[in-house]
Amino acid sequence: MKTFFLILFSLIAFSCAPQIDKEKVKQEIFNTEKSFEKMCAEKGIAEGFYSFADDSAVIKRQNDTLIIGKENIRNYYDNDFYKNASVKWAPDFIDVSNDGSMAYTYGKYLWTAKDASGNTSEFRGVFHTVWKKQTDNNWKYVWD
């Protein structure tokens, strides 16, 4: 009988888990991506990548280099190349965990940069970002 009540209690407890509106959360993530992009345009790439990073965020860059932690990410982008560059992107796909605590996006990006001679170069690619919901209900990336 104890087993029956334990199973019954467990089923009730698990069925009471709050349901999330995944479409609403996907819109939150899309809006976060656009706010991130806007901050990079208005306040600089270093500040944008710093502000939207979780404290333990990791970014993977050239030659499989990992930059770990938001301070190191800011330092990575705080140089003349990125100060003279701009970046645009938009998620083509967004998915959200069943409990609404994590999400990921991918899509196309375009970096535009000027060299010392003033010549402009463009770099295109595909990004993949993993987002984590914070205790204040904002989203920060943990992987980019």
Where are these regions (language model features)?
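A solvent-exposed, acidic/Ser-Thr-rich amphipathic alpha-helical stretch
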Residues: 23-30, 44-95, 108, 119-123
